[in-house]
Amino acid sequence: GDRVAMRALMRSRNFDAVIHFAGHIVVPESVSDPGKYYRNNVLGSLNLIECCEESGVGLFVFSSSAAVYGNPATIPVHEETPTNPINPYGRTKLITEWTLKDFAERTGSNLPLRYVALRYFNVAGASLDGALGQATPEATHLIKVACEVACGQRDSVSVFGTDYNTEDGTCI
């Protein structure tokens, strides 16, 4: 994020909290271009966290991801499920969670940071004009793909995995 613009905005208003939804989210792209994800998701988040601190904003909601779990040993996952991200996207989300934890637990700060990290599974949504969200042709998210199949724009939905504890071994 643009730290100068963020700092100016935060100082011009009296914000109580920040809800951080920004970030790159395409897993295959994170594998092919990890630097893009670390620069945007980790450094951008750090800039925002530091701007919050400088501006006296002590409440922070972070849009993390279930990708921080990787391939969990047990299903369903819960808050105590061990994290083990398997791609750069998941790692950037976990690093940002750790960063928030470190700022929250830090000693000597005049402003204690209180935060929550929300670990979503399949997020859906887009602006009506298609400028934001999963309305792009290359988006691979389950809900978007399933809607495309239902509308006849795609032939099928791929289901990955065959070793789940279900009747047919799939995750469904």
Where are these regions (language model features)?
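N-terminal Rossmann-like NAD(P)+-binding domain of SDR-like oxidoreductases, especially those catalyzing
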Residues: 1-126
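NAD(P)-dependent short-chain dehydrogenase/reductase
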Residues: 101-172
